[in-house]
Amino acid sequence: MNKFCVAVLVCAWSVATFAVPARVGHILDGDTFSAAVSLDADTTVSVRVRLRNVDTPEMNGDCEYERARAVAARDRLAEIIPVGSTVELSNVKDDKYLGRIDANVKNAAGDDVGEVLIREKFGRKYNGGRRKPWCK
């Protein structure tokens, strides 16, 4: 069912040029969170959202440095978009991992969440492909 909901969301949003509100459910790591999105007055779906064009360290990273930075990035994301807060999703596309979407995300203050993480050195720009290693 969740894969179907993601497919419906991606198809609907692929032609949309507007932002869609979503309620933050759970922060998974520094660049991924779950969100509840209302399709209509009676239907809300939960989706996993990955911040578009951002890479943060992995929670199960290759070295202690990466794992520590991953916790810091996750905690910072939780400060920028607290659980229960409303965010705006735009430029929504299907992610390479089924069941997840990529999107630009703005918080309640109107800040681009990915840009904040990059500016504050919790993440770096990412345009797909092979990730640069975080371990030295």
What does each of the following model-derived ranges do?
Residues 3-5, 13-136:
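Small beta-barrel nucleic-acid-binding modules, primarily SNase/OB-fold domains
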